[in-house]
């Protein structure tokens, strides 16, 4: 049995797994159950290479390379390097700002992200935490009238942040070159979206990539999305995750919003990231993912 310690107000961590020694099938089942029950799963103090990291991530789902390809890992394009470290020539070695605003990874794709994994390689002296906001709890707390209002609605998503008012105001992570933009379609997702594994409804990506609502005037749609985002990111729904060197954190994109936090530019930080996609809609979930996740692991 793997020992899990609760984070607060959701999420769990464990020191019982050493990915450098491989991961038994039974242990993976335990980890996956803890992941779906608690939305955030941290594997502390890992010492693995890029191949071992991607092997673990593939257990969670099919990896999808990030559209910003200039910061792919040199040995595997499925790993995105997040870093403020520069090389000897002064060139960036990674993507410095991966989203210091609440958002959902890959919500701009037709088949969005199941999970994101971050592996902390260099930790800053101060800050660099990740904030998570529980969108299942946020949906549950909505008034009945608001739940009824949003039930039939689909939000319009594309790459970026709706609070970037123009190209000049965008963060580095939000500005794509023409070839990268061509890969990014405009798609829609339900605002009140059932979780693809547990079936629990959550507010889905109401902050970040949601720019409008199908069939609704722009101003009205923006007001509704902003109202939902303000509700969904209240401190009572948030977890602040603090990294140690070698920590791996995995989070459930169907259930959470998340945000990076800024650090002193002089303080070095590097992480590796792999994001894996959900099972295609309509595909049967593996038997081990039958609804056994209603109660958190505590």
Stretches with model-predicted labels:
Residues 2-248, 254-298:
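Non-heme Fe(II) oxygenase catalytic core, chiefly the N-lobe of the double-stranded beta-helix
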